[in-house]
Each structure stands twice: as structure tokens, then as C-alpha cells.
Design a protein with these regions (language model features):
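Outer-envelope beta-barrel architecture signal
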Residues: 5, 70-72, 98, 131-135, ...
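Short acidic/polar hinge/loop motifs at secondary-structure boundaries
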Residues: 33-35, 79-106, 184
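Extracytoplasmic beta-strand/coil segments of soluble accessory domains associated
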Residues: 35-83, 100
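Extracellular loop and loop/strand-boundary signature of outer-membrane beta-barrel proteins
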Residues: 86, 132-134, 175-180
Length: 192
């Protein structure tokens, strides 16, 4: 016969596990690799490519689980954005150079996001560079962008300013009657 010592088995399990199966986080680096209309990176168009999201042609609005574009709560750093597009929905108001993360929750979102039925799109802006001043400039087919960032107090607080302006008005102007004051352009300024 063999004597065996007593074996004690203990275990722990959380009674409630927190999982969000309907939340998708898309890194901005991945969004920047998606082919874009006239080279203009568009966060809203990238969201339209996700599973469970439908789009309409030529518009930055998106449909989630049968709801309309007005049933999506869009937040920029926690602040609601009510009109998230320019030029009738061709371009979104979000400058990809100023964005850090994009998260889409397609259902089962917390009550604090009330007032919408379909989804919550959370967009967080980048923090400025805490170590050194830095700038980026981009000239594209339809717009130009400038981003400046740096420390206000080194390693404590920082700033980021990102601006974008289209120059579609320069292309359209020769085809417009001289008597009209109609211009076709937009500009954005994001600062944090």
C-alpha cells in the first residue's frame, strides 16, 4: 500500500465577467492604410467597412443593425458630434492626423450612452508630444493638412493642433458663373 498526502485544491472565479463582444477598436494606423477617395483618409468610410455596418453610396453616414445614421451616437473625446460630415456627406469632419483611437460599439452599450439605438462611435484625439516640438505637413489632391504638437511644460502637459483645408473651390471656380458667391470648400481645426 502507498500513503498519499492530502491534496487541497482551491480556486477563484469572478462571478461577473465584463466582456464587450460587440465593440470593435480600429487603430488609426490601420485606417490610414485603407484606399481613400482622392487620397483623403476618412474615418467614417473606414467604419463603413466593418462587419455589421452598412453604408450608402457617396455619404459618410452609416447604418448599424437596421437603424438610420441618426441612431448612431458619435463622440469626439466624449463630446457628441451632431453633424459628422462635410459637402453633403462626401468627407467626414475627423482629421486622421489628430486621432488616436476609434471604437465602434454595435449593441449592448452602457446606459450612459443613451438616446441612440444603433451604435456608439467613440473617437479619441491624440495627446501632444511631451518631449519635443514636432510638425507634419501634407499636400494632397483635394486638401492640405498641417499638424503641430509639443510640450507646454516638458513631461507634464502638451498641445496638439491639426488643421485641414480643401481647395476644391479652385477647381470649381472656372465652371461657376461670375455672378455667384458660392464657394465649395471646407476647413477643420482640431486642438487639444
Amino acid at each position: 500500500s502507498v500513503n498519499i498526502q492530502e491534496v487541497v485544491v482551491t480556486g477563484e472565479k469572478n462571478i461577473v465577467e465584463k466582456t464587450q463582444t460587440s465593440m470593435i477598436e480600429v487603430p488609426i494606423e490601420q485606417i490610414k492604410t485603407i484606399p481613400a477617395l482622392l487620397g483623403e483618409v476618412d474615418v467614417s468610410k473606414a467604419i463603413q467597412l466593418l462587419p455589421g455596418v452598412q453604408s450608402s453610396e457617396g455619404s459618410s453616414g452609416f447604418y448599424v443593425r437596421g437603424g438610420g445614421p441618426d441612431q448612431n451616437l458619435i463622440l469626439l473625446d466624449g463630446v457628441p458630434v451632431y453633424n459628422a460630415s462635410h459637402i453633403g456627406g462626401l468627407f467626414s469632419v475627423f482629421n486622421a492626423d489628430a486621432i488616436k483611437t476609434v471604437r465602434l460599439t454595435k449593441g449592448g452599450f452602457p446606459a450612459r450612452f443613451g438616446g441612440r439605438l444603433s451604435s456608439v462611435l467613440q473617437i479619441d484625439m491624440k495627446e501632444g508630444n511631451m518631449k519635443e516640438f514636432r510638425g507634419d505637413a501634407t499636400i494632397g489632391l483635394i486638401s492640405s493638412k498641417l499638424t503641430l504638437e509639443g510640450p507646454i511644460f516638458k513631461d507634464k502637459t502638451s498641445f496638439i493642433v491639426a488643421g485641414r483645408r480643401t481647395y476644391a473651390d479652385l477647381f470649381v471656380k472656372p465652371f461657376m458663373p461670375e455672378s455667384t458667391d458660392l464657394t465649395l470648400y471646407f476647413y477643420d481645426l482640431n486642438a487639444k
